[in-house]
């Protein structure tokens, strides 16, 4: 082997070897244990970022480790290729989304190969290809036939100037990103899939996902939001209209003092017909899109309708208000307000001087003070007529029973989860396979006309989808009748909800999935991706799997057994103030810093000599210009170094702080391993290790080796604490560096140690380990080498080093047999000269013995 570690040479050679040998190509082998490891597929944005590198390195480490355990390992990759960014880039670059996307895929594919990830490239998919989305379209038509797909009107962001629908990210401060026109909310027909039909399954099956992070499962439980309560009907005074609300707190029902309805509620429209001020307020509410997450912190606004509801149990009139915090798409679009016992209702009532009626006592039996806030705890009822004195459970049931008995209430289980709206008024997506006949009938596109192919040779004007601006595209015939195609495209979460299953049979053309292949590989054994996907992608991913199961395509209930959510990658962020006081962000690569003795940045200057302000560590992003290009780092240090740093710098699920000094440290370690291997191989071949004749020092080193193997095996396989696995290997290499290399047995032990270290490092740094394995004359390629197994007998200690204290002060150390009794240890201690002199002429009054570690003799 060459003396110097040159990653640029060995990495290219090893990658070529993998490509020529098709090392990572796999097929189904029914007699062999399978392992399916998958990282979330990337969007082909143009270049990999460090977040990608971290995600895919984790997946590759797990895949290579499992392969060394003898399993048939599938690790595929593909491209989540549809989406809005391609449309913006196409307009900006005066091209179409397709060529921009395919060029990005080619570039990023090469970047992935440079990082040495062991993918089966024969299984690569791009979700924008018709041979992929045709089956998605086919499946949608089957869901429609089963009654799981429907169309209804739903609100979208509408730019009246461009006459187009805008995605949420295209609305900036309430205005169109392109022309700055104020955006309106508009109701248009859209397609939905009934995810609510699977709400209970999605909730209950979370309990079976024992190897998913608790945080993800909690987020999904909250998103599904199962609640038990009562749906209650109010009569509207002086009207035949009725008003329905849902509550999980019927115990507070006697404290209702007003009812709030959404701006889109029919009663709101009815009241606004003769009330221009109310009509304006409703328009304001409907044109302001508020994310549900912001509901708690936004300013609560409302306006009285002039209508009243009749409380069904006490007959009192309660005012009906339109409120901006009530959403039409949630529940019934109306809520009963109990300001005495709900903080939001209290704030609204206080703002508009509405009545507040307490009906729940404090825990000590006193009446609550509602002057500063609502009393939201559960307790015994008062002010509630026949229900006074009842506790929460008794009151819940008594009031619910009374409402049911009177025919104005119904016990219901409700879900926060809403059906999945899959229509997008964009071009770059899979066309929705539905057509409208001349008589207005809407039917699925017949199977023999699938796929409905998205035209790729289009001109983007940045305003209207080419599918909508070209009426000829929509024209088709079905059974000889003229028909119009749907011009909306699928939400891109559709493609990423089933790609993992298509990887099992990407070339299969007889159906959506090849049952034999899908059921051999599925479920995924290990899924790796960011926690930001917890309630969108990961919910749809689980839902789609259950849909495919119920269609007979797969047999498992869940798509992935184990989930690892890697943390974000952070980097230093710097800026200076521009001429208008705005922050101009400077790349950390272009900044020189001075640090204090604790390593804190105290001064920073950019490469133009400007003082810049340090804004701390933040997530790598384009907006803060603090992304580090992985390719630059690979060219500078090698892929193995970048991979090693990514796995060592932080636990996988925690944030990782990018520090180039840490990358340099990883590089130094690999150079040290290379140098130790080089010096060892330069001395020629080694003899066989004779375990029976090892000295105590040699036994100690071999014990450390096999303890390290046991720890690294557990850290990678069970605990997934990859950073501690690497730390253990580094510690072992430090011990090896200090070990003598004089005798044949010394060198034989070094050979055993290096062969084990190279295999343990291989999942992290495969290129250098491939090369070192050959230099050390390991059997075959390391790609097919087995994972090292800890020798239990080597880890057994023949002797123990015991510290001897007299009256708590250390007076000596003795070596005793590992199984020595306390009496034997005391005898041996008494023979130790340094100890014996402190025992001369005194009486041992007490003995404290910690087996195999410490002997403390208390004398007097």
Curated annotation (Swiss-Prot):
Annotated ATP binding sites: 622
Pfam family, one: tRNA-synt_1g
Keyword terms of this UniProt record: Aminoacyl-tRNA synthetase, ATP-binding, Cytoplasm, Ligase, Nucleotide-binding, Protein biosynthesis
Keyword ATP-binding: yes
Enzyme Commission (EC) number: 6.1.1.4
UniProt subcellular location: Cytoplasm
GO molecular function: aminoacyl-tRNA deacylase activity; ATP binding; leucine-tRNA ligase activity
GO biological process, alphabetically ordered: leucyl-tRNA aminoacylation
Residues spanned by motif 'KMSKS' region: 619-623
Motif ('HIGH' region): 42-52
Enzyme class: ligase
Catalytic activity: tRNA(Leu) + L-leucine + ATP = L-leucyl-tRNA(Leu) + AMP + diphosphate
GO cellular component terms given for this protein: cytosol
InterPro entries: aa-tRNA-synth_I_CS, aa-tRNA-synth_Ia, Leu-tRNA-ligase, Leu_tRNA-synth_edit, M/V/L/I-tRNA-synth_anticd-bd, Methionyl/Leucyl_tRNA_Synth, Rossmann-like_a/b/a_fold, tRNAsynth_Ia_anticodon-bd
CDD domains: Anticodon_Ia_Leu_BEm, LeuRS_core
Family: Belongs to the class-I aminoacyl-tRNA synthetase family.
Name under which the protein is recorded: Leucine--tRNA ligase
Organism in which the protein naturally occurs: Pectobacterium carotovorum subsp. carotovorum (strain PC1)
């Amino acid at each position: 082997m060459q003396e110097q570690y040159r990653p640029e040479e060995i990495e290219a050679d090893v990658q070529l070897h993998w490509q020529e040998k098709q090392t990572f190509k796999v097929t189904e082998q029914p007699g062999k244990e399978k392992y399916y490891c998958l990282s979330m597929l990337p969007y082909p944005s143009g270049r990999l970022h460090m977040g990608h590198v971290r995600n895919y390195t984790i997946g590759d480490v797990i895949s290579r480790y499992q392969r060394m355990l003898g399993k048939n390992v599938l690790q595929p990759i593909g491209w989540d290729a549809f989406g809005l960014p391609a449309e913006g880039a196409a307009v900006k670059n005066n091209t179409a989304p397709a060529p921009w996307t395919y060029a990005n895929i080619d570039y990023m594919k090469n970047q992935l190969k440079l990082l040495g990830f062991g993918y089966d490239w024969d299984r690569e998919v791009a979700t924008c290809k018709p041979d992929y989305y045709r089956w998605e379209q086919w499946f949608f038509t089957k869901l429609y036939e089963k009654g799981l797909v429907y169309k209804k009107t739903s609100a979208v962001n509408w730019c009246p100037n461009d006459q187009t629908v805008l995605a949420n990210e295209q609305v900036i401060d309430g205005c169109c990103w392109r022309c700055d026109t104020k955006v309106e909310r508009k109701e248009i027909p859209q397609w939905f899939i009934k995810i609510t039909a699977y709400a209970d399954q999605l909730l209950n099956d979370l309990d079976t996902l024992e190897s998913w992070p608790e945080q993800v499962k909690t987020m999904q439980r909250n998103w599904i939001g199962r609640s038990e309560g009562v749906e209650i009907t109010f009569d509207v005074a002086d009207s035949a209209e009725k008003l329905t609300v849902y509550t999980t707190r019927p115990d507070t029902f006697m404290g209702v003092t007003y009812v709030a309805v959404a701006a889109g509620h029919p009663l709101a429209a009815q009241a606004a017909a003769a009330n221009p001020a109310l009509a304006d307020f409703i328009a304001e509410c409907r044109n302001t899109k508020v994310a549900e997450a912001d509901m708690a912190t936004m300013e609560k606004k409302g306006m009285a309708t002039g209508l009243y509801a009749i409380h069904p149990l006490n007959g009192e009139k309660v005012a009906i208000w339109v409120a901006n915090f009530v959403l039409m798409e949630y529940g019934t679009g109306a809520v009963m307000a109990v300001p005495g016992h709900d903080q939001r209702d209290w704030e609204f009532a206080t703002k508009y001087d509405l009545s507040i009626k307490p009906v729940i006592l404090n825990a000590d039996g006193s009446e609550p003070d509602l002057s500063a806030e609502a009393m939201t705890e559960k307790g015994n009822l008062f002010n509630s007529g026949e229900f006074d004195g009842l506790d929460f459970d008794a009151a819940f049931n008594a009031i619910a029973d009374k409402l049911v008995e009177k025919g104005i209430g119904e016990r219901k289980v409700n879900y926060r989860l809403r059906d999945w709206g899959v229509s997008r008024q964009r071009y770059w997506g899979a066309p929705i396979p539905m057509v409208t006949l001349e008589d207005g009938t809407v039917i699925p596109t017949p199977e023999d006309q699938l796929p409905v192919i998205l035209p790729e040779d289009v001109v983007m004007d940045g305003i209207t989808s080419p599918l909508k601006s070209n009426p000829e595209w929509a024209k088709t015939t079905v059974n000889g009748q003229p028909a119009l195609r749907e011009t909306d495209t699928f939400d891109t979460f559709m493609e990423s909800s089933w790609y993992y299953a298509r990887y099992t049979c990407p070339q299969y053309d007889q159906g959506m999935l090849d049952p034999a292949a899908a059921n051999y590989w599925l479920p995924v054994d290990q899924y790796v991706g960011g926690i930001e996907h917890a309630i969108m992608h990961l919910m749809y991913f689980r839902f789609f799997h259950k849909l495919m199961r119920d269609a007979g395509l797969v047999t498992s209930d869940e798509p992935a057994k184990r989930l690892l959510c890697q943390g974000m990658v952070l980097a230093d962020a710097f800026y200076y103030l521009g001429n208008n006081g705005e922050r101009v962000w400077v790349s950390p690569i272009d900044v020189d810093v001075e640090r204090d003795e604790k390593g804190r940045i105290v001064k920073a200057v950019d490469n133009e000599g400007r003082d810049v302000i340090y804004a701390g560590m933040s997530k790598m992003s384009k907006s803060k210009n603090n992304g580090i290009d992985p390719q630059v780092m690979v060219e500078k240090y090698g892929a193995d170094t970048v991979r090693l740093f990514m796995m060592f710098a932080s636990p996988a699920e925690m944030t990782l702080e990018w520090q180039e000094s840490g990358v340099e440290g990883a590089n130094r370690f690999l150079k040290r391993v290379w140098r130790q291997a080089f010096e060892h191989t330069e001395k020629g071949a080694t003899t066989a290790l004779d375990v029976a004749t090892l000295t105590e020092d040699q036994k100690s080193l071999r014990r450390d080796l096999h303890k390290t193997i046991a720890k690294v095996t557990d850290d990678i396989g069970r605990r997934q604490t990859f950073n501690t696995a690497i730390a253990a290997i580094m510690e072992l290499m430090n011990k090896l560096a200090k070990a003598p290399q004089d005798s044949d047995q010394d060198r034989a032990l070094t050979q055993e140690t290096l062969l084990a270290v190279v295999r343990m490092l291989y999942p992290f740094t495969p290129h250098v380990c491939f090369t070192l394995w050959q230099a050390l004359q390991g059997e075959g390629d390391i790609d097919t080498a087995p994972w090292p197994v800890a020798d239990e007998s080597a880890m057994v200690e023949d002797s123990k080093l015991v510290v001897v204290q007299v009256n708590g002060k250390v007076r000596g150390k003795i070596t005793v047999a590992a199984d020595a009794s306390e009496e034997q240890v005391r005898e041996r201690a008494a023979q130790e000269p340094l100890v014996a002199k402190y025992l001369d002429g005194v009486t041992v009054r007490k003995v404290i013995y910690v087996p195999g570690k410490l002997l403390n003799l208390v004398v007097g």
